[in-house]
Amino acid sequence: SGSESGSGCGRWAATACVVTGASRGFGRSLARLLAPRLGRGSLLVLLARSAEPLAALATELRGDGGPGDDGGPGDDGAPGLRVRCVAADLGSEEGLRRAAAALRELLPAPHYGRLLLVNNAGSLGDISKSFLDLTDPDEINSYFAFNVTSALSLTSTALQAFGKRPGSSRTVVNISSLCALKPFKNWALYCSGKASRDMMFQVLALEEPDVRVLNYAPGPLDTDMQLLARTKTGDPGMRQHFQSLKESRNLIDCTVSAQKLVNLLEEDTFRSGAHVDFYDI
């Protein structure tokens, strides 16, 4: 069954797509771009902590008067697309278990020929603190539970649940950062979390050559995270750096960066496990 009418509709036949951190910022922009590309019989799973913005996004993506979470065809941009919301705090064991259970329930359906998992959920940590201020193991462990553990656990769960299918394609995207490659003052947690995730997904690419793996650094985005960076970072030089990015209008609109990621996925020529930055493309 080939492509359907409409702009981009049906380009990706029967895809199971999962986006974490989908309620705002880059994740929301990406979900809005992906939905019209997902053809009949596709599933879009939106994962985030906050239920209300997720539900609002799901309603928008289905089209007004679209179906409930249990599927059926939507009215507008994505005919035949099921949208499921999973509200879960991925930093807690209970939330991670709930998210994993949803993936185990939804992904094994045999008609999906493609899996796309986008690990976008993440946080900055307390960037007012220097390295020497980070003495509380509970604070450190909770940061890595959300930013590293959940990405590893959900990715392995999703790949296991989807399984290996003849002729199918499986793609895993990690939303990375320049901070995975370069240290920044006061950002010990964020930089080490991003570096850890990049390496983790490089190992996945090595172990599973049939899975396409991409570490995509979206550039400095005009989001709430950037607002925190320029107001809360402990180091004055770093605060000034982020302030000047805003003042010189060098922050990137989320939709512009998300579109570059979609282009990368559609071209599908990246080396598996590669770190690709917005400015490389």
Positions of PLM-derived features:
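Conserved glycine-rich cofactor-binding loop
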Residues: 21-24
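Conserved glycine-rich Rossmann-like NAD(P)H-binding loop of the short-chain dehydrogenase/reductase
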Residues: 39-57
